[in-house]
Every structure is written in structure tokens, then in C-alpha cells.
Amino acid sequence: TPHVQGIMVEYPMVQARQCVVVSDAMPLDQAACVEPLAIALHAVARAGNLLGKRVFVSGAGPVGCLIAAVARLNGAASVAISDMEAFPLSVAVRLGADAAFKAADPALADLANGCEACFEASGSVGGMNTCLRSAAPGGTIVHVGFLGEEEVAYPINTMVIRKEVT
């Protein structure tokens, strides 16, 4: 099934084979969360044990907010999240994030080298770089966001030699 970018619209156009019939017994607001929650659960599982760990999430869309919630439910000591918009950050806080930062907030620098698990859910190169800066040495970065067809250069020396991130 091809990836569809930008599905957060009132009336998305998708192919019939991408649709699933939902029981009338399931409320639509819950049904709408199934797919992003599945992604969040998978991402958090990829990060390993989060008990007592500091977590950072770049991107407070549906997937990023649900990653924050699942990380909190999996015992993360703290969960910080960033986004370009204020409203999704407020949702993330309601779902369990301890700290929410606008992407341009200089306070994001305080996370540098301090998060044992980072999740890139914004689909942006800037978000990827913020995760890399925020990751503690030996930490884990789980890349969830879709960057489209753009070629991205990962700073391998920083990731492997200086930080030893996985």
C-alpha cells in the first residue's frame, strides 16, 4: 500500500484498497486513532525499555502525541516534545508530555545529550537534527517521520563515533 502524505484533512482521497470497514459499534474518533496508535506502539517497542529514561519526541502530530503517551505509559521518567505549532503541543501535554517546546525555542538546547530515547515524528530534517542533538551518548533514535523523496545526509561521525547512538 503506498504511503499517503498529508492525510490530516477533512476529506482525504485514498484508494479503496487502503480502506477498512469499521464496525458500527466502534466510535469513529476511536477508529481514527487505530493506525497512528499502531505506529506509536511499534516505535516505542523499537526503542526498547523506557523505564526511568528521558524521552524526546520531535513532532506533535497524531503519531508524535501518541508516542509521548505510550512512552509515559511505558515508564519514561520524563517526556519532552517539540513542534512548530502551539495547539498540538497542548495536546501532547494532555497526553503525558512533561515539557513542550516550539521548534525554534532556544530552551530545546537544554535537552542536548540528555535523552536516552528520541523519536523523530515530524518528517523534517530539522526534527532529525534536533533528535541527534538531544540524544544522550549511547542513546536510541527511532526515525518515524516520512521525509518524502528528499535525500538526507546523516552525520555518521556524530552518530557513530561521538554519540554511539543506535
Regions found by a protein language model. Give the residues of each.
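Glycine-rich phosphate/adenylate-binding loop and adjacent beta-alpha elements
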Residues: 1-19
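Short, glycine/polar-rich helix-capping loops at beta-to-alpha or helix-loop-helix junctions
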Residues: 7-8, 84-91, 150-156
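Glycine/charged-rich beta-loop-alpha catalytic/anionic-binding loops adjacent to active sites
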Residues: 18-28, 113, 164
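Mid-domain Rossmann-like dinucleotide-binding core that forms the NAD(H)/NADP(H) cofactor-binding site
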Residues: 26-105
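Redox-cofactor binding/interface segments in oxidoreductases and associated redox assembly factors
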Residues: 102, 120, 143
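A short acidic, Gly/Pro-enriched loop at the edge of an enzyme's catalytic core
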Residues: 109-118
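Glycine-rich phosphate-binding loop and adjacent beta-alpha segment
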Residues: 125-166
